[in-house]
Amino acid sequence: MSIGGITYKKINGKRYAYYQWCEDGKQRSRRVKDDELESLVAQIELAKSQAVLERSMELSDGRAVYSAQPLSVFKTDVKTGVLLENFSDPVKGFKKRECFAALHDYVYGANNDRVLVLYGLRRTGKTTLVRQLIGEMDAAHRAKTAFVQVNTRHTLADVNHDLKLLESQGFKYVFVDEVTQLGDFIEGAALFSDVFAVGGMKIVLSGTDSLGFVFSEDEQLYDRCILLHTTFIPYREFERVLGVVGIDEFIRYGGTMSMGGTNYNKDAFTFATKKGADDYVDSAIARNIQHSLKCYQYGGHFRSLQQLYERGELTNAINRIVEDINHRFTLDVLTRDFASSDLKISVSNLRRDRMHPTDALDKVNAVAVAQEMKRLLEIMDRNECSVDIEDAHRVEIREYLQMLDMICPIDVVNMASLNQNAFRTVLAQPGLRYAQSEALVRGLMMDEVFQKISIGERNRIIARILDEIRGRMMEEIVLLETKMARPDRQIFTLQFPVGEFDMVVFDSENACCEIYEIKHSDKAVPAQCRHLQDKKKCHETEFRYGKIKGRYVIYRGKSCRQDDIEYLNVEEYLKDLG
């Protein structure tokens, strides 16, 4: 018996559906009831997909090798029917990211003539989101769904050809993955919205060159696209989706949805090793920027970065910025001889450690440390640069890193000089920062001074350095996630001539604020809240920002209250932001 198909007849002005098929050499037909039409259409489409698979089956080394469709039909890799089931099955047990709801609403919502752009840096869960959505589809929807995989060998004309074929066959839901690999995507992206979305297709575009999507929105898509970001991964998602609990684990590995958590599998995290972090910076960030600039305006928009790109020094500049991301993004960061800001801070803190003061780091050969860091991070110092790094380079690199959602500025307000504009640049991927810190520790361990002191003292010094780094990073994480979760508030650090409030949450409309100290400690001690209880600081703050509604210490211990100070557990605080 043949698969058959649906035809329609008009009788007395009314349209009726009929199922026609061939059986024993004879054509047969029957009327299809309205309530069974959708299910029957799905069964027919599924049977057709299976038939195509059988026709395209080849034998190689005794094993069956399947292609999604005959090579003569599609020019890209198109998956439909049974292949979609195989494609989505491996992620059925995975927990979903919060942005899954927006993807679901677009696919199943009313047609609005727009495409959805799912973009973000590598390993932030874009393809997994698509596979999860396809995996939850019923048979009727899946029969009208196709997943299109493209690469650098394909062109926009190839994708256009395949989308027309899919449209003619009744496919409605099309996911195009790695679409930014198309060299002509940025200049021709309007094809997806102006031709296919307006025709009733739901088009989801995804890719790792997120900068390319930003360019295409400006050049081609305008208001005909919905942008769905995946790069920013807050702690609450890291814990819930990956099943990895604890702020220190987030500091070490946060920033990607690499399948390293208990809810995924036991593969290594992206930032578990220095090499992994370096590879990520090179492929997900530097090459992202390079590829997008190469394709944007036919390579005519490199601006001041042209020389850096041509001489292979863009990765060098980005690495330098990431290493010193906690400090002002100034020309000095890019042009000075490489030196570790983390080491300078740790030297000072170790000298004034109340329990175990030591000047061991004063004896460390700082040049040797810098050289080891240079070797590990593969960063050329200024003398090795074949092109001068100027202020224009700094500005443009910072712009692109912000477009990639990789960095975010947090205001730093000086109470003594309110007109002074300052900010701290926070990295959205803490694991990348921590990987560089571990490289610093390796450099210290190789210094001769450390070989001359006891292993107990040596380990204590190293532990203190890493604790200082984690403390600074925890502060940044709290600031960033609070800013992202509370866009109706102003989030900033407030500095005084002596001391500071680590975070102020200012409600300008209601003339009130909250003040915070952020400590990496797991113990509540009086010294943590001395600034919060400073009457002069609080009076100046209330004069400028209104009534103080709450005083808080965010730390790693249990939530509790001591007098007028609320102690908040950091993991609980970050999860409550959702």
Identify the role of each PLM range.
Residues 215-360:
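Interdomain motor-coupling "hinge/lid" segment immediately C-terminal to the ATP-binding subdomain
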Residues 293-501:
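Accessory nucleic acid-recognition modules appended to NTPase machines
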Residues 126:
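Conserved lysine of the Walker
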Residues 33, 46-111:
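A short, basic N-terminal segment
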Residues 195-217:
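Sensor-1/coupling segment of RecA-like P-loop NTPase cores
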Residues 549-578:
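Domain-level recognition of nuclease-like catalytic cores that cleave nucleotide substrates
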Residues 129, 133:
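Hydrophobic positions on the alpha1 helix immediately C-terminal to the Walker A/P-loop
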